[in-house]
């Protein structure tokens, strides 16, 4: 019974570590985590031979109707290496738990939020974020939000060595040692696959 408890605790620890590592490109994407072009993951100046491409707001903003609409406009204006429009679209909003109520109002309300105007909710009626939103409890900044786009080969996860566990007993002391090992890496191939805001 004790062995089972320790094994479960080790498995939980490994899972917790993997989830924390998985959000590192997002959490640090505005400061230290770089994409393949040597700029930070979320930048207004990803260099191409035809000019710069942006995957973040010009002025960082909290999640609201204006910032979400501008993000979707910016995504639609993304270009390839030659400066040609690629007709990119947003697919899914990824948010910390602190923004789930804001996201629900923005995505599910029939009318516009935080206004007395009798306008429709264009984001909802136009299906601008078809896969809705997803709460990631491991995001550490309560203001950051991200949009997964339909550009292929964006964020990547490589499983280099699946998890392996082992245990052994010590004859002299009667102690039992447990260990677990796995190798993986999280990163990005094409920065156009994700769009982000660091919050105001």
Please state what every model-predicted region is.
Residues 28-47:
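Charge-rich, acidic-biased intrinsically disordered regions
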Residues 27-34, 132-133, 138:
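Beta-rich nucleic-acid/ligand-interaction surfaces
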Residues 42-80, 87-92, 98-200:
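Sequence/fold signature of self-assembling virion shell proteins
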Residues 1, 85-86:
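Exposed beta-sheet edge/beta-hairpin loop segments within beta-rich domains
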């Amino acid at each position: 019974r004790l062995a089972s408890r320790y094994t479960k605790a080790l498995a939980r620890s490994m899972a917790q570590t993997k989830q924390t590592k998985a959000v590192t490109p997002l959490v640090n994407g505005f400061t230290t985590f770089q994409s393949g072009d040597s700029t930070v993951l979320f930048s207004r100046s990803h260099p191409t031979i035809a000019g710069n491409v942006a995957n973040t707001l010009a002025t960082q903003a909290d999640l609201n109707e204006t910032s979400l609409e501008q993000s979707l406009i910016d995504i639609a204006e993304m270009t390839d290496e030659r400066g040609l429009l690629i007709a990119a679209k947003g697919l899914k909003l990824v948010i910390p738990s602190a923004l789930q109520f804001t996201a629900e109002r923005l995505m599910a309300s029939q009318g516009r939020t935080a206004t007395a105007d009798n306008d429709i909710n264009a984001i909802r009626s136009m299906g601008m974020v078809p896969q809705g939103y997803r709460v990631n409890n491991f995001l550490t900044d309560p203001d950051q939000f991200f949009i997964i786009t339909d550009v292929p080969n964006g964020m990547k996860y490589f499983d280099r060595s699946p998890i392996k566990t082992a245990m052994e007993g010590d004859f002299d002391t009667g102690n039992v040692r447990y260990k677990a090992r796995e190798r993986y890496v999280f990163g990005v191939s094409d920065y156009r696959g994700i769009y982000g805001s660091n919050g105001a």
